Every structure is written in structure tokens, then in C-alpha cells.
């Protein structure tokens, strides 16, 4: 995966205060940065008053310039003391030159009264790379979405309205590239009639730009030595509203439990329906699953999703608190087993990723990390590892707002007014405001989603017991398959890939394929474990014909084909949506990496909240993309990015 040019902030320290060498300016007031933040951004967006009386279930702040995170921490502190306990704060901040972890820690140490908040931020402020990253605090009540890159490139990729804007960053005279007409126009595009803004600057170019974009602008007293500042509100557009209600999620694997969890976190009462007597019985039922990103040399959607999902899953697992018996960050070595793979790995390693995310290691270093002799160098992911899928699913489904209906197969869905009725045979099982279909290939069994081109792929894993006295593998090894480190006295390796095969009996020939992979990846380990008869498990995974998941709202495909829409200025309004019906499926063998972030995408879209990824990626995952392309309507492939009617 190719990433944009990326560099961390170049800081100087003047009398203990951070100073930007690039912009030639300070990050905050030398006299009282805290009071300046509270005066400019909190007070002049009327946040305390708005939060004390807010009716919606979430509030979104968008900031230009994260800097030291001071504005975020002050907003979080005020939120905790003024907002109702059941609502959420989304703080979206765009930063071109993020501080290193060490510099951020040093800067935030200047504000001891914020220590509890800065400590929580620093605990998650790792592996910060270009693009979208979501950090979650207070059991989901506070969410920070960091957008690393150029503000004018990233701002159009937002997927929700802002309730308040923090126009920070450096002064227009120091940072003219940011303070452009495009900034103000994009602000207008993502504002509603109650959206406010505040900024420390009173420059004429800013005042005129905001007014031209539709903002009512006031010049008021600044803070300290700053005589004037600007604040105001947007004058157009109504804010869409969405309240949590009742949801049914179909499917008890990683996609279904993650979807249930993200909705439950937002106050939904969720009925999680699974046809088996327990969760995680099919593709999510393997004893061990691996968690790592599969990156490409170039910026392709699958690589972008893989990286975003990997980082999201690492943070989610940390929040869930799975113990060492269920999850371990043992590190992963992606072996450069031939010349093509060597070039791919080294190209990725040279793209500027932080070393704590990935870096190249030579053959000797790889062997030292693994604990066994290896024949190849590798791309090393220090935080990658393994997880027990069943424990993961149980933790996700353990939310107090989730009830489980097990050993029950959903056979049909029907609309009844503004609700969805969920049927098992002739019996009405439930009635809900929204339904999320997350039952793998069985999603295509419903009339409403039978147009989804899902494919089934058999995969078999093999387990080999450790031999006493032999070297122990400590890290995850990957090529086209994987070998786990030693877990419960055995190694897990796999998985085979057999498209179109839906049988689940264990086969000797597929054990042989896995053993051949082991022999090629780690011959020294193979020699110590053979001869030995492996045990194993086979399951059927679900993928799409283009190997990208299907995530988003569902169209009425029959009506679409009967009456294709004409071109309109608003493509979302021209499509026959099935309001309240969503799908999260087709994750294939990468479900542990991609399904949780897909669930977060769905929940955010339902609530008009900022997405954890850019709008281009949301569009790529549109579950209706195949039928739209078939009808020559490729321009309407938008999915979650186009804000269809939610109910």
C-alpha cells in the first residue's frame, strides 16, 4: 500500500514550550494555553450550554490542526462534566504533521490538570500513519478520529456533518496553504443550521471566506494579547436526526457480533440471532485466528481497508480487555520467500511507515524474532498477533444492550410500516427499526439481498503438536498462508483455499498442502515436527466476486431494475432504498481484520456520525455496486458515503 509523503512535526523547544520549526510559530499561548483554548473554542462555540441541553445522541467537532491535542483534551474534560452520560462526543481532527509520541508526551506534561486525559490519549497514540485512525475512550463515549494529511485533500472525504468547527492550525500568514476558499466551502458542505465555528484569527481573508460560504460571522474579543477573534454559525441546512431504537442483527460470527456491539454502544437494544446453539460456530469458529494487514505496493482499496481495519482491531481488542489466553501481540513476519515478494516487502518498508507499525528485517533478524532458523528476510509487524475468534465474539456480544436468540434460523424479512419484521418459518420472531444482515453467504437467501454476488470458499487448518526439546516458534509467520506461534502446546497452520466447495470434512490432501507450506516457510520447524499426523478443522468462508466486503445499506434491486433512475443532482434520493436494512458480509479470510471496522462504518452511518474511513473507501464497499454497474449506473455506487434515508 502506498502512502502519501509523510513527516512528523519538526519541533523546537523554546523555554520548555513547543515551537513549530516548519511554520515558525508556537502551538499555543505561552501565557495560558489552557485558558486560550477554553475562551476561543469552547466558550465561543457555546459548548457547555449546548451540551447541557442537547437532544441528539452524539455531538461532532471537526478541528483543523490537532497539534498537541490540547483542544481535544479540553473539550473532553468539559464534555465529561457537562454532557448527559448517555451521549457521545466525536472529535475529528486533521493534522498534516503529527507530533511524535515523545514530543506529544512532553508537550502535554505542561498541563498537569489534564493528566488523566493525556495519559489515556498517549496510551493509544501509536502507529499514527496517513489517513484515518480512530481512538476510542470511555467505553465509546468519546471518540477521536485523526485524519493525517493535507486538510484540503482530506476534508472532502468526511461522511457526516459537524456540530462545531475548531479552526485552529497556524495563522493565515504562517500557513496560507490551509486558509483557502476550498476550506470554507467544505466547511459549508458539512454543516447544518445549528453548526457553529470559532477561530483564534480575525484575518480578513478568513472572515470574508466564511461569509461567502454561508456563515454568519462575528468579531469578538480574543484572549490575552490577542485583541480579536472570529466566531459564528452556519445559516443553512437542517441537521438529520437519528435516535437509537431496536435492532436485529442476523449472524453470530465476527461480523454479526461486531455489528451488534457497535450498535449497542450507541444505545440500541439489539437482538443477535444465530442459527447455531452458540456463537462463532462456522468460519469464526477456528481455535486461533490471525490479525495482521496485507498491504500492497500501491494504494488499492483492499490494502487501505486492511491497514485501517488492522489498526482499528488492535485498539478494539485493547478496549475489550481480552486476557493472554485469548489474544497475544506476538508479532508477525511476512516472509519475502521469492524475488517478487522481496521487492513488494522492501517497497512497502521504504514508504515511511512508523517502525512500530512495520519495518524490514533481514534473515538473521527474522530468525532471532521467530526463535527458529529462517531462510528469508521479512516485513515485520511488531503488534500483529493471534486471537481466539470465539472469545472475541463472546466479548463483543457481552454488552448489556445485547440479547441473544440462539438455535434460530431467520428465514424471511418483511417491511411493516417503518419497521422490519423478522421471521423464522411462519413465526414472527421480532420487529425492529433496523436489521443488519451479517450471516455470511446466507445473506443471499433473503429476497431483499439475493442480488448480492457472494461466493463460498472452503478453508482447512492443520494443528501440529510441539516436540519436546525442539526450538519454539515465538512469532506469527505468513506468506500466502500462516503458521501460528506455539499456542496450547501446538502450532496452527493454514488455511487452504477451495472456491465453491461447501463441505467441512477434514481431508488428508489439504493437510498435505498445509504441511508443504510449513516446509517451504520454516523447514527447520518442519523437520522437528515430522513425522506427525496433524489434526484440523475445515470451514466455509464467504467472499464477494471482487474480494472486497459488502458493507452498507441495501437497495430494492427488483425495483431498481424495473425503473432505473435518471440523473439527478442528489444520487442518493434517486435510488430505491430499503430504509433500515443493512448488510455486513463477504469478509473472506480477513474477517478478524475487516469486519469490526465495517461494523463501525455501519453504526456511524446510521447515526450520521464521522466514519472511521474516508468516503471513497465507503463507496468501494457499497453492497449494491454490482447491480448498479450491471445497469450502467456506476456513477451511483456510493453506499454509506451518500447518506441514504436511515429509516
UniProtKB/Swiss-Prot annotation:
GO biological process: methylation; tRNA wobble uridine modification
PANTHER family membership: SARCOSINE DEHYDROGENASE-RELATED, TRNA 5-METHYLAMINOMETHYL-2-THIOURIDINE BIOSYNTHESIS BIFUNCTIONAL PROTEIN MNMC
Known role: Catalyzes the last two steps in the biosynthesis of 5-methylaminomethyl-2-thiouridine (mnm(5)s(2)U) at the wobble position (U34) in tRNA. Catalyzes the FAD-dependent demodification of cmnm(5)s(2)U34 to nm(5)s(2)U34, followed by the transfer of a methyl group from S-adenosyl-L-methionine to nm(5)s(2)U34, to form mnm(5)s(2)U34.
Record's catalysed reaction(s): 5-aminomethyl-2-thiouridine(34) in tRNA + S-adenosyl-L-methionine = 5-methylaminomethyl-2-thiouridine(34) in tRNA + S-adenosyl-L-homocysteine + H(+)
Database matches in InterPro entries: FAD-dep_OxRdtase, FAD/NAD-bd_sf, MnmC-like_methylTransf, SAM-dependent_MTases_sf, tRNA_MAMT_biosynth_bifunc_MnmC, tRNA_MNMC2, tRNA_S-uridine_synth_MnmC_C
UniProtKB keywords: Cytoplasm, FAD, Flavoprotein, Methyltransferase, Multifunctional enzyme, Oxidoreductase, S-adenosyl-L-methionine, Transferase, tRNA processing
Residue numbers spanned by region tRNA (mnm(5)s(2)U34)-methyltransferase: 1-235
Cofactor dependence: FAD
Family in the record: In the N-terminal section; belongs to the methyltransferase superfamily. tRNA (mnm(5)s(2)U34)-methyltransferase family. In the C-terminal section; belongs to the DAO family.
Pfam families: DAO, Methyltransf_30
Entry keyword Transferase: yes
Protein name: tRNA 5-methylaminomethyl-2-thiouridine biosynthesis bifunctional protein MnmC
Amino acid at each position: 500500500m502506498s502512502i502519501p509523503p509523510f513527516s512528523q512535526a519538526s519541533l523546537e523547544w523554546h523555554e520548555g514550550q513547543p515551537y513549530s520549526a516548519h511554520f515558525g510559530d508556537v502551538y499555543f499561548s505561552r501565557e495560558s494555553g489552557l485558558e486560550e483554548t477554553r475562551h476561543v473554542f469552547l466558550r465561543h462555540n457555546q459548548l457547555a450550554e449546548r451540551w447541557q441541553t442537547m437532544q441528539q445522541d452524539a455531538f461532532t467537532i471537526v478541528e483543523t490542526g490537532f497539534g498537541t491535542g490540547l483542544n481535544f483534551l479540553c473539550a473532553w474534560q468539559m464534555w465529561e462534566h457537562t454532557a448527559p452520560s448517555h451521549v457521545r462526543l466525536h472529535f475529528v481532527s486533521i493534522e498534516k504533521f503529527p507530533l511524535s509520541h515523545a514530543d506529544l508526551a512532553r508537550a502535554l506534561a505542561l498541563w498537569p490538570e489534564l493528566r488523566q486525559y493525556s495519559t489515556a490519549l498517549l496510551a493509544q497514540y501509536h502507529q499514527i500513519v496517513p489517513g484515518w485512525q480512530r481512538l476510542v475512550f470511555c467505553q465509546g463515549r468519546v471518540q477521536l478520529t485523526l485524519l493525517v494529511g493535507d486538510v484540503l485533500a482530506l476534508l472532502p472525504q468526511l461522511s457526516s456533518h459537524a456540530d462545531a468547527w475548531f479552526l485552529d492550525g497556524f495563522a493565515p500568514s504562517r500557513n496560507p496553504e490551509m486558509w483557502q476558499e476550498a476550506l470554507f466551502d467544505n466547511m459549508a458542505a458539512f454543516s447544518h443550521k445549528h453548526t457553529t465555528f470559532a477561530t483564534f484569527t480575525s484575518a480578513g481573508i478568513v472572515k470574508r471566506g466564511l461569509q461567502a460560504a454561508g456563515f454568519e460571522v462575528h468579531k469578538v474579543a480574543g484572549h490575552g494579547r490577542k485583541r480579536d477573534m472570529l466566531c459564528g454559525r452556519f445559516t443553512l441546512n437542517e441537521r438529520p436526526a437519528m435516535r437509537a431504537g431496536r435492532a436485529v442483527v442476523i449472524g453470530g460470527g465476527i461480523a454479526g457480533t461486531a455489528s451488534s456491539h457497535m450498535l449497542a454502544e450507541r444505545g440500541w437494544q439489539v437482538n443477535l440471532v444465530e442459527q447455531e446453539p452458540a456463537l462463532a460456530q462456522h468460519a469464526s469458529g477456528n481455535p486461533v485466528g490471525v490479525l495482521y494487514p496485507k498491504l500492497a505496493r500501491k494504494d488499492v482499496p483492499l490494502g487501505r481497508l486492511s491497514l485501517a481495519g488492522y489498526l482499528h482491531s488492535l485498539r478494539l481488542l485493547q478496549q475489550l480487555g481480552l486476557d493472554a489466553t485469548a489474544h497475544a501481540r506476538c508479532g508477525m513476519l511476512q516472509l519475502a520467500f521469492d524475488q517478487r515478494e522481496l521487492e513488494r516487502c522492501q517497497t512497502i518498508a521504504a514508504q515511511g511507515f512508523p517502525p512500530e507499525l512495520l519495518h524490514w528485517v533481514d534473515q538473521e533478524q527474522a530468525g532471532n524474532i521467530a526463535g527458529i532458523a529462517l531462510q528469508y528476510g521479512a516485513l515485520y509487524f511488531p503488534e500483529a498477533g493471534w486471537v481466539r475468534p470465539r472469545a472475541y465474539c463472546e466479548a463483543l456480544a457481552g454488552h448489556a444492550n445485547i440479547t441473544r436468540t440462539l438455535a434460530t434460523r431467520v428465514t424471511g424479512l418483511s417491511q411493516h410500516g417503518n419497521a422490519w419484521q423478522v421471521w423464522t418459518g411462519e413465526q414472527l420472531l421480532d420487529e425492529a427499526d433496523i436489521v443488519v444482515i451479517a450471516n455470511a453467504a446466507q445473506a443471499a437467501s433473503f429476497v431483499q439481498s439475493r442480488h448480492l454476488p457472494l461466493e463460498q470458499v472452503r478453508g482447512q487448518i492443520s494443528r501440529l503438536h510441539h516436540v519436546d526439546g525442539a526450538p519454539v516458534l515465538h512469532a506469527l509467520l505468513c506468506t500466502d498462508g500462516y503458521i501460528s506461534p506455539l499456542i496450547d502446546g501446538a502450532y496452527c497452520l493454514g488455511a487452504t483455499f477451495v472456491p465453491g466447495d461447501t463441505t467441512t470434512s477434514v481431508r488428508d490432501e489439504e493437510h498435505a498442502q498445509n504441511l508443504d507450506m510449513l516446509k517451504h516457510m520454516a523447514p527447520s520447524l518442519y523437520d522437528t515436527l515430522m513425522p506427525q499426523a496433524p489434526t484440523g478443522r475445515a470451514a466455509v468462508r464467504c467472499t464477494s466476486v471482487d474480494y472486497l466486503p459488502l458493507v452498507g445499506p441495501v437497495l430494492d434491486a427488483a425495483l431498481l431494475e424495473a425503473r432505473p433512475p435518471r440523473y439527478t443532482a442528489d444520487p442518493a434520493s434517486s435510488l430505491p432504498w430499503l430504509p433500515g436494512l443493512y448488510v455486513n458480509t463477504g469478509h473472506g479470510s480477513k474477517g478478524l481484520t475487516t469486519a469490526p471496522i465495517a461494523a463501525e462504518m455501519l453504526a456511524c452511518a446510521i447515526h450520521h456520525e464521522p466514519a472511521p474511513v474516508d468516503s471513497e473507501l465507503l463507496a468501494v464497499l457499497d453492497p449494491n455496486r454490482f447491480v448498479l454497474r450491471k445497469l450502467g449506473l456506476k456513477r451511483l455506487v456510493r453506499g454509506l458515503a451518500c447518506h441514504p434515508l436511515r429509516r
